[in-house]
Amino acid sequence: MEGGGDDDGGRSRAEAIMRELERLRAEREELDGRIRLLESQLRLGAAPLPPSAAAEVEPTGSPSSSSSAAADMISRYRRHLLLPQFGLEGQRKLSQSSILVVGAGGLGSPVAMYLAACGVGCLGIVDGDRVELDNLHRQIIHIEAYVGQPKVKSTAASCRAYDIVVDATNNLPSRYMISDCCVLMNKPLISGSAVGLEGQLTVYHHNGSPCYRCLYPNPPSSPTSQSCSDNGILGILPGVIGCLQALEAIKVATAVGKPLCGRMLHFDALSSHTRIVKISRSSPTCKVCGENPVFTKEDFVNFDYESFTQSPMSKNSTTRSLNLLPENARVSCRDYKKVLDSGRPHLLVDVRPSHHFQIASMAHSINVPLSLLEEKLPLLRDSAREVSSRRDGRQHCPVYVICRRGNDSQVAVQILRENGFLYASDVAGGFESWAKEVDPSFLLY
């Protein structure tokens, strides 16, 4: 009996010890939970919870929503946090920054996607266009189901509310307009461009770097400017430049690294060659950002950037078509259709580049690219003489010139008339008008 009592006493003591261990473990788990929450709050830059609130923290296994959110943030960006040059402070600055991306196309798509993924606090996107099928090979933020829909449902009125602006518009009048706006609002501008197989990138109006007008007080003298719709673009190129724009925006937002201030990056997709060249600092005589600027906010509101650059901001702009010739040197597409239907001998010269001609052309045309026109004048004279021989003794041969949109053809007619082709005429509006007004089956590209 006595031995049995000793056994019962030993079991009671063991059970008491086990209960105490369980209590202490639970208390330790609760304290660990409090510690993790406070550490998370500290990492995210928030003020620590008061003791009364901290005492209400649930033990591990049932974390509070704040603790869960903090842990998710740390888990999501831990690869950033591991970078000694970036770390918690860089992520905190990025999460508190606001960046405006102007353009949601080939450049803006990767910019917006990566800035959002990297944790920018406020991301704005401005774009008035709608998604088109030929956008999808390079504008990776859009999908085919969105064709015809606005690229953004709402547009910011100005860049005033944002810390940094990214120009992803890729056209000349917008480039001037956004740069002027950033100077007037005193915002750094990350500017990139990509056309054909080449791209470039720089940071304007930041740490002494120039604005766009410092480098280009006046637009180029050529009446036409390069664009993706005119010159084409390899789909991946704006992705490369757009990612670099996102990188520069992050560097400016976090003050980490050395942004491309006073330097311009050039990228050649064919050779994969990248070079960085120095550009001039802010010009003291610049009318927008110089020592005595004369360009005011009122000037900005009233300034006609399309007229200034002789270039359109979008394909819907009324300035898209040039007007270089007198009326008697131009015919409408419908009038040219009457010439075709009449069977009168004539010469139709297609001055598009040869690779455009291979995409779609008119069967009776001859292709003489504008860049080769003066070199090929003897060939055209021979062709014109051959046509004249079929015109019932008439000496002159009517020459009609056509291009994609009716701009290059006007330049070509000027050259032809200066070189003796007095009956050369431009087919107004080019193949775009031809497809709309005469032959809807003609393949536009």
Curated annotation (Swiss-Prot):
The UniProt catalytic activity note for this protein reads: [molybdopterin-synthase sulfur-carrier protein]-C-terminal Gly-Gly + ATP + H(+) = [molybdopterin-synthase sulfur-carrier protein]-C-terminal Gly-Gly-AMP + diphosphate; [molybdopterin-synthase sulfur-carrier protein]-C-terminal Gly-Gly-AMP + S-sulfanyl-L-cysteinyl-[cysteine desulfurase] + AH2 = [molybdopterin-synthase sulfur-carrier protein]-C-terminal-Gly-aminoethanethioate + L-cysteinyl-[cysteine desulfurase] + A + AMP + 2 H(+)
Q: What Gene3D superfamilies does the annotation carry? A: NAD(P)-binding Rossmann-like Domain (3.40.50.720), Rhodanese-like domain (3.40.250.10)
Any one of the GO CC terms: cytoplasm
Residues the record lists as binding Zn(2+): 211, 214, 286, 289
Q: InterPro entries given for it?
A: MOCS3/Uba4 (IPR028885), Rhodanese-like_dom (IPR001763), Rhodanese-like_dom_sf (IPR036873), ThiF/MoeB/HesA (IPR045886), ThiF_NAD_FAD-bd (IPR000594), Ubiquitin-activating_enz (IPR035985)
List the transmembrane segments: none
Q: How is the cofactor bound?
A: Binds 1 zinc ion per subunit.
Q: List the active-site residues.
A: 228 (glycyl thioester intermediate), 403 (cysteine persulfide intermediate)
Localization per record: Cytoplasm, Cytosol
- What job does the chain carry out? Plays a central role in 2-thiolation of mcm(5)S(2)U at tRNA wobble positions of cytosolic tRNA(Lys), tRNA(Glu) and tRNA(Gln). Also essential during biosynthesis of the molybdenum cofactor. Acts by mediating the C-terminal thiocarboxylation of sulfur carriers URM1 and MOCS2A. Its N-terminus first activates URM1 and MOCS2A as acyl-adenylates (-COAMP), then the persulfide sulfur on the catalytic cysteine is transferred to URM1 and MOCS2A to form thiocarboxylation (-COSH) of their C-terminus.
| Identification of the protein by name | Adenylyltransferase and sulfurtransferase MOCS3
Q: Which gene encodes it?
A: MOCS3
